[in-house]
């Protein structure tokens, strides 16, 4: 049986690599860790994973990215991966964004 997948999404390559490295060091025995560098790339990856009937357990996304915010990505990902948990990361102290994410897209 294939390992469930954790998808990380961040347009900053150094941040993306660091998050992926940290997740792999802790969870590689139980999860397959993959990454995308944009919301559009993440949605393409999620669609392909769904076509292959692979389980996405967690999506970890940066909030501020060009083209699509993390909130938009997590909202658009819901129909494709309804069972996945979702985490929104931001380096900014933006309380309004956090409240919107929790209320509008049901972040845990």
Regions found by a protein language model. Give the residues of each.
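Acidic, metal-coordinating helix/loop segments flanking the phosphotransfer/catalytic sites
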Residues: 20, 26, 35-58
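Short acidic/polar segment at the start of the alpha1 helix of CheY-like receiver
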Residues: 12-18
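Alpha4 helix (beta4-alpha4-beta5 surface) of REC/receiver domains from two-component response regulators
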Residues: 68-72, 79, 93-108
